[in-house]
């Protein structure tokens, strides 16, 4: 009988079993080596988060297996303290089916998903929670409550989304932004998108040198492709201090950003080529396509987070497996704990 070829998307099971003192039963079949290699980067990130204070997190509309167990598993790793907001009878039903004891978690009843999103934002504004986690609802439904002008969570920064990605064929994790929030960002929007991603990368990267590749279809500046003009402007803005704490170069085509060989073959001399930490997409469509191509064709492991709001917002695709939701919670934990530490240092000076 032919063995089944699998991708073990519950790659945190063994670590969790050790943490809880339970028996680990590995999945049957042949493991996907590329996926496992990529997952090692995220396992390292999880281990680095061990010891950080868990953050109280409003989980919005967790009425399916993935959204509920994603929050529960993150709680088992002591990354978050979930506050489950949604129709209580539906939460209880999915908990019963998946053998989750809700006695350990606070549940706030909300009849509909939009009401759950509104309540989560209210808790964040009152500082009763330190993060928000998307459950089984549409992104625009959650983000409408977040960006609402009267009672939302806006700051002076443009809100943006970042995917943290890892693939076996690239030596380190990298960010793709923005692939979920800003559809056709202006130059000013892109400045904030880039700065948000830089700030995140500094929180999670042990080597503090951050390199940003601003992507377009070509590596030369031409008015025929307006995104090359934006890329060139962003690069110069970094030179002038309008974008801080990173080397920014663009326009760069994807191959030139990822492959030093491709850049050298085209005669491109860039400090970013082959060593990018952040890939800035021209628009949402191209960024979303790039991230999902890497996930489904390149066996990428990915986590998603919304930046620039008053609290980190854990935002993944509804099709994302449980462990990728856990790693997204880890990103929120890094943001919360390091921001809190920075504010403490500033207050003591």
UniProtKB/Swiss-Prot annotation:
Pathway the protein contributes to: Metabolic intermediate biosynthesis; acetyl-CoA biosynthesis; acetyl-CoA from acetate: step 2/2
Organism per entry: Rickettsia typhi (strain ATCC VR-144 / Wilmington)
Enzyme class: transferase
Annotated protein name in UniProt: Phosphate acetyltransferase
Keyword annotations from UniProtKB, A to Z: Acyltransferase, Cytoplasm, Transferase
Protein's gene: pta
NCBIfam families to which the protein is assigned, alphabetical: PRK08190.1, PRK11890.1
Cellular compartments per GO CC: cytoplasm
Catalyzed reactions: acetyl-CoA + phosphate = acetyl phosphate + CoA
Pfam families registered for this protein in UniProt: PTA_PTB
């Amino acid at each position: 009988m032919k063995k089944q070829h699998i991708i073990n998307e519950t790659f945190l099971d063994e670590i969790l079993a050790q943490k809880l003192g339970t028996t680990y039963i590995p999945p049957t079949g042949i493991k996907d080596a590329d996926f496992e290699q990529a997952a090692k980067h995220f396992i390292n990130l999880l281990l680095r988060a061990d010891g950080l204070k868990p953050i109280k997190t409003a989980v919005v509309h967790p009425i399916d297996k993935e959204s509920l167990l994603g929050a529960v598993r993150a709680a088992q790793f002591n990354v978050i303290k979930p506050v489950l907001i949604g129709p209580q009878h539906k939460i209880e039903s999915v908990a019963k089916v998946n053998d989750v004891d809700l006695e350990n978690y606070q549940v706030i009843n909300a009849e509909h998903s939009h009401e759950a999103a509104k309540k989560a934002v209210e808790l964040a504004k009152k500082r009763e929670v330190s993060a928000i986690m998307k459950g089984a609802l549409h992104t625009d439904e959650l983000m409408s409550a977040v960006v609402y002008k009267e009672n939302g969570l806006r700051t002076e920064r443009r809100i943006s989304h970042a995917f943290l990605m890892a693939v076996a064929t690239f030596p380190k994790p990298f960010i793709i932004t923005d692939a979920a929030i800003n559809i056709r960002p202006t130059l000013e929007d892109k400045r904030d998108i880039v700065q948000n991603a830089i700030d995140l990368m500094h929180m999670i990267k042990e080597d503090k040198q951050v390199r940003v590749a601003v992507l377009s279809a070509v590596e030369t500046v031409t008015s025929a492709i307006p995104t090359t003009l934006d890329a060139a402007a962003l690069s110069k803005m970094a030179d002038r201090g309008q974008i801080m704490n990173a080397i920014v170069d663009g326009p760069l085509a994807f191959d030139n950003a990822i492959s030093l060989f491709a850049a050298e073959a085209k005669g491109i001399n860039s400090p970013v080529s082959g060593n990018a930490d952040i890939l800035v997409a021209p628009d949402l469509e191209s960024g979303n396509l790039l991230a999902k191509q890497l996930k489904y064709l390149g066996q990428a492991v990915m986590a998603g987070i919304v930046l620039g709001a008053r609290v980190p917002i854990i935002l993944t695709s509804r099709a994302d497996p449980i462990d990728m939701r856990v790693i997204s919670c880890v990103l929120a934990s890094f943001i919360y704990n390091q921001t809190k530490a920075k504010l403490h240092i500033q207050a003591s000076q």
